[in-house]
Amino acid sequence: WPGPTFTDSGGFQVLSLGAGFRKVLAMDVDRVQADDIIAEGKQRLAHVDDDGVTFTSHLDGSTHRFTPEVSMGIQHQIGADIIFAFDELTTLVNTRGYQEQSVARTHAWAQRCLDEHRRLTEAQPDRPRQALFGVVQGAQYEDLRRQAARGLETIVDAQGRGFDGYGIGGALEKQNLATIVGWCIDELPEGKPRHLLGISEPDDLFAAIAAGADTFDCVSPSRVARNAAVYSASGRFNITGAKYRRDFT
């Protein structure tokens, strides 16, 4: 692969273990209840505080600590071209108060990530420089999304260097996806790339592109393929169906 590579910060992977999503990051909040998504404290495998996340392995029960600095260290070791600041992922059913706390926490973590990224970069001057993207959170709230986006623009390291690009993350209401993306795009600088995290449905891609998003990532396309389904101009269909057995078009 001659093109650029990306690595995520680990925020989704850690928090999806327990802090805690029982089912999904629901894009259609009207069809789910809070207890469908948010696990009770005793059922959570991850616990968040202002410093980072402590999580329990679902494989062997061991305890691990994940912080912005740890995330930067791992992503530097992997060596992807574009890496992301460690952020706190929330759902559409978290309270407004918690969303406010989360935006503030993600902002603080973004500063720590930028500082650690600079330190690690300077410690290895012979390696190609990795680009670091800050992540906009704020769920479905316009003021929080705009606040988060503006806040990321103010963050710089000791040399006065800010983020190389921006990710738009968190749970997004499907019916309002383009609107939410548009709020963020309005506040982010035009000269830097904007990446939309966790979106891959064809109709969502077109809506997000129209709103100003540049690139995307999601596990869904490979999952769809593993389950013998494909997307086409006429929609999604399962290629194991009998009527497609001899269809090679």
Q: Predicted segments — roles?
A:
Residues W1-D126, R245:
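Non-catalytic, usually N-terminal nucleic-acid engagement modules in DNA/RNA processing proteins
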Residues A104-H107, E116, L120-A123, R127-T249:
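Glycine-rich phosphate/ribose-binding loops and adjacent secondary-structure elements
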